[in-house]
Amino acid sequence: MAENRFMQSKRMAEPKTSPHEPENTCDLLVIGSGAGALSTAVTAAYLGLKVIVVEKDAQYGGTTAWSGGWMWVPRHPLALEAGLVERIEKPLSYLRRELGAQFDETRVLTFLTQAPRMVEFFRKKTALQFIDGNTIPDFHGRTPDASLGGRSVCAAPFDARKLGHRLNDLRPPLHETTLWGMGIAAGAEMRHFLNALHKPASFWYVGKLLFRHFKDLLLHRRGTRLVNGNALIGALAQSALDLGVEIRVNSPAVRLLQKDGRVTGAVIQTSAGQVSIQASHGVMLATGGFPHDPARKKQLLPHAPTGHEHWSAGNRGNTGDGLRLGESVGGVVAEDMVQAAALAPVSLVPKHSKTRALEVGSDNNHTHFPHLIDRAKPGLIAVTSEGFRFANEADSYYDFMQALLAATPAGKKPEAWLICDHHFIRYYGLGAVKPAPMPLRPWLSNGYLKRGFSTAELAAHCGIDATTLQATIQKYNAQALLGKDPDFGKGETAYNRIQGDAIRVSARGLRNPCMAPIEHGPFYAVQVVAGSLGTFAGLRVNEHAQVINPQGLAIPGLYAGGNDMNSMMGGYYPAGGITLGPAMTFGFIAAHHAAKRDPAETCIDPAPQPKTQSTKENSMYYELATMTLPFGTAAQAASQVQEFATQPEAQGELLGCWFTDIGVLNQMLVLRGFSSLQALGEERTRTQRSASPFGCGGLYQSLEQTTYQGFPWMKPVRPSAESGITGPVYEIRTYGIQPGGLQATVDLWEQYVPARDKLSPCVVAMVALDGPLRFTNIWAYDSLNARSQIRGEAVAQGIWPPKGGPAHLTTHMVSTIAMPTAVSPLK
């Protein structure tokens, strides 16, 4: 059905040409080939414009092809379908607080309005499909109106064989971030790779991917299962080519053409000489910003006084061409941003075995590896050459770099060392170094990785003060055992926790998913320096992505997108995906403006405002399964439940796994969360048809599964590592509800729970969707004594139970006290 819609859109978009039309004429000329460029090209072609894309390099895709591919798109349709509905005021308020004086309400509102339509357009009309990031939080969870999820999407895996002969023109993923050239998707897929030697299901999952990849290498000389940013570019390219867009590589733009003050095309350098391409509707500049333009870096990056002290992970061909082209016809580059670049720590990976990792003056001999996720894993710290920690290592890459710049004395080069032990590097890897069974020797030989059999020896190899480093590690180890980082708050935000590893930490009896002792030698270090994922400072534009002059007037026929457009975030970084989300959206907007079309006509808004006050946010579905087990089998059953719930074909998320302590004994309670009833139903079918439901077919004596929907005002249940909610005593209470009493109960609980929550947290309140009308609520307590004291205090203060609440309930009331098993995400 999706293919039929796509073929229909293709027919609608046949370019309007005549037999006498010159070869180098088009309606819209797009300079560049990253996400912003191809979003513009695909949308314009769908709207009926003839489009030519010219790319400076030998392969299309730009920095996007190397990226994680995530896009920040609040209120996107996948979140809406999962029941995560929010008013536009929520993300608007978050950005207003985050951006401060840089907040541009017109552009921000335009983005928040059109971004959901952009996603809906591409998934309904093109080859590009998405996966949701509904559990990915914003970077700064302490800022009011930050979200715990529902604001991110990523391109779904893409089969590059669909590109045919144009496959070889697609820029492959950054080799150092792959396994033998095979991209690995973030999230569940990455966890399978980390667990491939530890869990049979993960071993099987990884084995299948490797088999296909090696087959691809034999047949195509490269992988064809694309993920992350490579999948985004692959799907956009297929969509563009199918819509008749011409993509030319090795075709840098030399200068823009103008007539009567309007940009009408550009002169392009080709192997046969220069050619002029006329563009009747305008030109889009999307050449990737200036991450490798020394002159502009010297001007806009204070930590790069010569322009060479900044090592960007962006594509080497991004040298500021679009900015210079825009300036040549009256455009202005924004120079007042808080930061001109999307800062990130990078390590310098030698391209050749004889190249030392930090050899001065030989930048072309190194790949710039961005450290995006390793810093948050438990058992790693970052220190300066003096041996001191200076930051919360689990914070975003941008915030980490801000802290490093602040800790660097004037006149010194910003640099730090990431320190870990042998257990860490063999499980997680470090930077470009892969985990076991991949060898360490090549990295030790070329100097990228430093090793010491004691912390003093490691310090000597790195030029770090040995005494201070030893004291820093000792202090950190003590904090890790307590699960608290009083110095920098590591592990305290939802973003920190989701980047950590709660499962591995809990297996070691620790509490903080981002902290574990550094104690098992040898010890290792990789140096990181000041870098970025791209640049923020670009050509000033209006809400239509039109380039404006110093007076704020649009330059007719000229648009800027991607990193050639000044970031609407003003140099701040409030969430992952704030580069690609706006890039895709403003490309979509620019194409409509060039075609003189309204985006609302192209695609119905997939995320309308809630029409009544009864439509709430964060609706989630749950299954609570109750198994009766033989005495002494709880540990075995829990392990099998975890394996069953994390199989590749499993849907939903394991949230809680408890064993009863008071009430009906020898029962295991398993709570799983789902984004939709459809997903829950499919997983229920899988469980029931399994030869061994929950992996416990040979153990349990009875199994009962109940479907629930969370009270609509409650936030979704999250593991302890993300929510901070812990027991270890959990009370699971179920009440029958009188006919007609459901809405009154929901409303009363919404009114009374916030005050009661301050005494002990309500994990969830949820109404059963099958069987008698009833609801179940789960509370967490530190101990049985704490439960008794808190319940008494709540009654004494008059904050619980809700006044008038019992009148809506039946006499069916059941209470169970349960303790978390070792595999329970709720601890």
Regions found by a protein language model. Give the residues of each.
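Residues forming the flavin
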Residues: 2-91, 130-614
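Long, well-ordered early-domain segments
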Residues: 99-141
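Non-transmembrane alpha-helical segments in soluble domains
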Residues: 112, 116-123, 237, 323, ...
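A short structural micro-motif
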Residues: 114-118, 256, 475-480, 690, ...
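Glycine-rich beta-strand-turn "strand-cap" elements at beta-sheet edges
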Residues: 620, 630, 653-669, 689-728, ...
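Short glycine-/aliphatic-rich beta-strand segments at the starts of folded cytosolic domains
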Residues: 621-627, 729-735
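Helix N-cap motif at beta-to-alpha junctions
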Residues: 633, 673-679, 738-741, 780-786
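Short amphipathic alpha-helical segments
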Residues: 633-654, 679, 685-696, 739-764, ...
